[in-house]
Amino acid sequence: MVIGGHNMPKFNLMSYIMPPEDKMFFTLFQNSAELCIETARLYTHIIESGLTTEKKEQILKAKKKGSISLKLTLKQLNKSFITPLEREDIQYIAVRLYKINKRIAKACLNLEVYRLLKYTEEMKEQAS
């Protein structure tokens, strides 16, 4: 549309009123859950064979991915007029998945902070 010689972007009110793709939030939740599993497996691997620089970088990347996933979910929630679940429930699930990933990553990084070179049987059991 051209107004006063300027191209104006089309505004589609229906895209704001209609719900997003049916499975969008569930897909975002699935991706976050898979990231939690990936981070937990990395923690297990670290407990079994030690924390290396490469594994530390992987943990930091996983932590960053979790943050990005949370932001994407909340951004989509803020854009959506109609949602498949209650807004509070979507936010709660997204934040909990983020916190799970963050805590696992923090546990991995704390191995270095506290200079733990040997891992107890309890730590190994927790990791398995």
Please provide the spans of the model-predicted regions.
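Cytosolic, long alpha-helical scaffolding segments
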Residues: 2-128
